[in-house]
């Protein structure tokens, strides 16, 4: 019964009864959504971190800033380039990872754990559910690698 509900509402492998679920964007950010308290944690993927190489500076939004889906909310500067940061969900910044602001190399070493960037309040489950699952993101990366050969 639940699986029929999920299929009919186009919810990808995301039981509404799970507390945490992580999704990935085409711009190589990840979002871990806590459905119970309607917060999410956002960071960049290992792939993005590897592409940037040496991260030297991170600019994040002010606390309580509105984060608009698909609009830049900050950037990461490396020795190679400056890359904008995007969220695939709307929300409000409620916590910034001050550790990565002081020591940006944390993102290089632990992009999907200690290198998280911001925590947001969000009710944007619909946009979150449109993001890629881990397996879909893995296939997305394989397709990128094929096109770069």
Curated annotation (Swiss-Prot):
Gene3D superfamilies: 2.40.50.100. The modification N6-lipoyllysine is found at residue 80. Belongs to the GcvH family. The glycine cleavage system catalyzes the degradation of glycine. The H protein shuttles the methylamine group of glycine from the P protein to the T protein. Residues 39-121 form the Lipoyl-binding domain. Binds 1 lipoyl cofactor covalently. CDD domains: GCS_H (cd06848). The glycine cleavage system is composed of four proteins: P, T, L and H. The keyword RNA-binding does not apply. Its cofactor is (R)-lipoate. It comes from the Eukaryota. The keyword rRNA processing does not apply. It comes from Dictyostelium discoideum (Social amoeba). InterPro entries: Biotin_lipoyl, GCV_H, GCV_H/Fam206, Single_hybrid_motif. It holds the Pfam family GCV_H. GO terms for cellular component: glycine cleavage complex; mitochondrion. This is Putative glycine cleavage system H protein 3. GO terms for biological process: glycine decarboxylation via glycine cleavage system.
